[in-house]
Structure formats: structure tokens, C-alpha cells
UniProtKB/Swiss-Prot annotation:
It comes from Methanospirillum hungatei JF-1 (strain ATCC 27890 / DSM 864 / NBRC 100397 / JF-1). The gene is rps5. InterPro entries: Ribosomal_Su5_D2-typ_SF, Ribosomal_uS5, Ribosomal_uS5_arc, Ribosomal_uS5_C, Ribosomal_uS5_euk/arc, Ribosomal_uS5_N, Ribosomal_uS5_N_CS, Ribsml_uS5_D2-typ_fold_subgr. The lineage of its organism: Archaea, Methanobacteriati, Methanobacteriota, Stenosarchaea group, Methanomicrobia. The N-terminal domain interacts with the head of the 30S subunit; the C-terminal domain interacts with the body and contacts protein S4. The interaction surface between S4 and S5 is involved in control of translational fidelity. With S4 and S12 plays an important role in translational accuracy. GO terms for molecular function: rRNA binding; structural constituent of ribosome. GO terms for biological process: translation. This is Small ribosomal subunit protein uS5.
Length: 205
């Protein structure tokens, strides 16, 4: 269902500024460093955002009243054009865990700096990343290298899903650690993409 800004009642100052039209783009918020605490802020600027459930796990915990079971969902959101978010959520119901993970991913949204950093290509189109970047999560380390146009996403299935939603079409990836742990693999890939904002260069988006 399409987001209707007129029905939204903002709970934060930033949300009220967005609804009043004082903020014109999501980039304005991300570049300011202000934390996004309402997913509706992202919905207002990126209506084409899609979500992908990467993993659902059962988590058990012993309490005084006995064993409690919850589900943990891992989700990425993106618009396939330079924006990506990663989140996780826990709840006794699978559907509610997914909803919480989507909210978490939206409020953790980042802009990915794209470009053509491959010396084999040099086309200046934003099909890859501008430079080598690395991301860590738990025991997993993911290193992304710029690749020439047409190479595709040379990485595992989880990494591909994250990169595709970010709008990256060509990249070489190297992984270390327990990549079978979906949450760490996805988060490390997300953190590597997040690192593209650390350096500003020309010829990229």
C-alpha cells in the first residue's frame, strides 16, 4: 500500500519538518547526520523502496517461567538505485519479527556512493563502486573491489541480494570468516557499502 503522508502523525522534530515540507530530500537528512527514528521519513522520500527477508531464525531463551521462543528476522531494504538499509527484529510471531526488521532497516538507511573504480573499465558510469572497501560483522569480513562493466556480482547469494538492492551491478567480493552465518554476512556486506561514503572522489554517485 502506498504511503500517504497526510495520514502520518510525526513523533519527532525531524518527522514534523519532513511533513511540513521543510526538508526536500532524503540526502539532506543523511548528509546532516541526524538520526532517523521514524520509518515514515524514509517512506516519504523513497516510495519505491523494496524489502527482502534474508533469514528467519528461531531463538530460544530460558527464563524463570520456562523456555521462551522468539523468531529473529534479518531484512534489507533498498531502491536498487543507491540506497540500502539493514535491520533485524525479534518477536514471538514471524510476521511481527519481519515488520520490526523492516522498520530497523529503514531507520538504518544509508546512501551508497557508486562509480566506476575499475582500471579495466573507466566508463565513469555508476555501475560499481569507486574504490576498494571493507566491512566487518562478527567473524565475517567482506572486501568489495570495483569490477568492469559486464562482470556482474561475483559473490555469494546473500551478498548478491544486498548489492542488488543497493544498485550495484558489477563487483568482485572476497569473504573471510563464517559466511554461513547469514546475519553477519549480510551486515558485513552492508558495512562495506556504508564505507563507500568515507572517501569523496569525482565521477561517481
Amino acid at each position: 500500500m502506498a504511503f500517504d503522508k497526510s495520514e502520518w502523525v510525526p513523533l519527532t522534530g525531524l518527522g514534523r519538518m519532513v511533513q511540513a515540507g521543510e526538508i526536500k530530500s532524503i540526502d539532506e537528512i543523511l548528509s546532516s547526520g541526524k538520526p532517523i527514528k521514524e520509518p515514515e521519513i524514509v517512506d516519504a522520500f523513497l516510495p519505491d523502496l523494496v524489502d527482502e527477508v534474508l533469514d528467519i531464525n528461531m531463538v530460544q531463551r530460558m527464563t524463570d517461567s520456562g523456555r521462551r521462543v522468539k523468531f529473529r528476522a534479518v531484512v534489507v531494504v533498498g531502491n536498487r538505485d543507491g540506497y540500502i538499509g539493514f535491520g533485524q527484529g525479534k518477536d514471538a510471531q514471524v510476521g511481527d519479527a519481519i515488520k520490526k526488521a523492516i522498520v530497523s532497516a529503514k531507520i538504518n538507511l544509508v546512501k551508497v556512493r557508486r562509480g566506476c573504480g575499475s582500471w579495466e573499465c573507466g566508463c565513469s558510469n555508476p555501475h560499481s563502486i569507486p574504490m576498494l572497501v571493507t566491512g566487518d560483522a562478527g567473524s565475517v569480513r567482506v572486501t568489495l573491489r570495483p569490477a568492469p562493466q559486464g562482470i556482474g556480482l561475483v559473490t555469494g547469494d546473500i551478498g548478491k541480494k544486498v548489492l542488488e538492492l543497493a544498485g550495484i551491478r558489477d563487483v568482485w567480493a572476497q569473504t573471510q570468516g563464517q559466511t554461513r552465518t547469514t546475519i553477519n554476512y549480510a551486515k558485513a556486506t552492508f558495512n562495506a557499502l556504508k564505507a563507500t561514503n568515507m572517501i569523496r572522489l569525482g565521477g561517481m554517485e
